[in-house]
């Protein structure tokens, strides 16, 4: 009886190990936009964003859109001491001189 259990275990264990192998990637996923370092990310419906947008005469899209405030581009990761101490985001929308960048999604990377 014990030998059957061990035999089945030795047959099934490699199958389970092979089934759970998932390739791991540590690189950020921002293939359709640009990496930005922003002081904060807010909804377009936020009152502060509304004031800034009104003063600059910018028309944003939907109110559930995320926008980055005071952003600077991150061009090359890990070269030249590039670091972001605020929020690293991937932005796919318009960039208004870095003051407001539309369509930003926060991503977690260690820069």
From Swiss-Prot:
Self-assembles to form functional amyloid fibrils called rodlets. Self-assembly into fibrillar rodlets occurs spontaneously at hydrophobic:hydrophilic interfaces and the rodlets further associate laterally to form amphipathic monolayers. It is found in: Secreted; Secreted, Cell wall. It comes from Pleurotus ostreatus (strain PC15). Disruption phenotype: Alters the cell surface structure and mycelial hydrophobicity. Does not affect aerial mycelia formation on a liquid medium, nor the stress response to H(2)O(2) or SDS. Aerial growth, conidiation, and dispersal of filamentous fungi in the environment rely upon a capability of their secreting small amphipathic proteins called hydrophobins (HPBs) with low sequence identity. Class I can self-assemble into an outermost layer of rodlet bundles on aerial cell surfaces, conferring cellular hydrophobicity that supports fungal growth, development and dispersal; whereas Class II form highly ordered films at water-air interfaces through intermolecular interactions but contribute nothing to the rodlet structure. InterPro entries: Hydrophobin (IPR001338). GO terms for molecular function: structural constituent of cell wall. GO terms for cellular component: extracellular region; fungal-type cell wall. This is Class I hydrophobin 2. Induction: Expression is not affected by carbon source limitation. Keywords: Cell wall, Disulfide bond, Secreted, Signal. Disulfide bonds join 30-90, 37-84, 38-71, 91-104. Its main location: secreted. It holds the Pfam family Hydrophobin. Residues 1-21 form the signal peptide. Acts as a good biosurfactant, stabilizing emulsions in several conditions (concentration, pH, and salinity) and decreasing surface tension to a comparable value to that of some synthetic surfactants. Hybrid protein-metal nanoparticles can be synthesized via a simple one step method using vmh2 and gold. Vmh2 strongly binds to Au core whereas surfactants act as outer shells. Even if engaged within the hybrid complex, vmh2 can interact with a model protein, BSA, more than a standard organic-metal nanoparticles can do. Belongs to the fungal hydrophobin family.
């Amino acid at each position: 009886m014990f030998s059957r259990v061990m035999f089945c275990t030795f047959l099934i264990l490699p199958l389970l190990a092979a089934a759970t192998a998932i390739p791991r990637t540590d690189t950020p996923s921002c293939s359709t936009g640009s990496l930005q370092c922003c002081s904060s990310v807010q909804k377009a419906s936020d009152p502060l964003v509304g004031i800034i947008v009104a003063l600059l005469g910018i028309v944003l899209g939907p109110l559930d859109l995320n926008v980055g405030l005071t952003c600077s581009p991150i061009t090359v990761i890990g070269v030249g001491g590039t670091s972001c101490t605020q929020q690293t985001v991937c932005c796919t929308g318009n960039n208004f001189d870095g003051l407001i960048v539309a369509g930003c999604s926060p991503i977690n990377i260690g820069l």
